[in-house]
Design a protein with these regions (language model features):
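Walker A (P-loop) ATP-phosphate-binding motif of ABC ATPase nucleotide-binding domains
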Residues: 2
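Glycine-rich phosphate-binding loop used to anchor ATP phosphates in small-molecule kinases
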Residues: 52-93, 102
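The conserved Walker
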Residues: 9
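Conserved substrate/cofactor phosphate-moiety recognition/catalytic segment
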Residues: 18, 22-60
Length: 161
């Protein structure tokens, strides 16, 4: 199984991903690490990414996910996956891909982003992320107002892990 932790920037994908990976003994991949330098530069300057910017990045993540699914191994991937188009692209590996949507309100996430240091994604881009977001119909939805330990426990319970 490959768990894709999705949601807007600041929703806790990295924190939850590391916690899940530690508890399950699965590898964790930070989707941000797969962005080409041009994407990172744009976001660092407060410029939202277009679909054309995102597609090569999504293809790199899709290829990683396919490797795990095809070899019958487990992994956790953090990826915003804001649009249904993006999720379909990532899910091309088949039914062993499970999306977990880390859902929270704008104010909570903005507060978290403003507290972050050394991250290229600035709080000023949060509005564009929410505008781009198409809430998923096929995902485990998780309320991020709970502490990370509770979120991880909920995900494990719901997925039978």
């Amino acid at each position: 199984m490959v768990i894709v932790l999705m949601g807007v920037s600041g929703s806790g994908k990295t924190t939850i991903g590391h916690c899940l990976a530690e508890q399950l003994g699965w590898p964790f991949y930070e989707g941000d690490d797969f962005h080409p330098p041009a994407n990172v530069a744009k976001m660092s300057q407060g410029i939202p990414l277009s679909d054309d910017d995102r597609l090569p990045w999504l293809d790199r993540l899709r290829d990683l996910i396919c490797e795990y699914v095809e070899s019958d191994k487990n992994a956790i991937v953090a990826c915003s996956a804001l649009k249904e188009l993006y999720r379909r692209r990532l899910a091309q590996a088949g039914d062993r891909v499970c999306f977990v949507y880390l859902q929270g309100d704008y104010d909570l996430i903005e507060e978290r982003m403003e507290a972050r240091q050394n991250h290229f994604m600035k709080a000023g881009l949060l509005e564009s992320q929410f505008q781009t977001l198409e809430e998923p119909e096929k995902a485990l939805v998780v309320d991020i107002s709970e502490p990370p330990e509770a979120i991880v426990g909920f995900i494990r319970d719901q997925l039978g892990l």
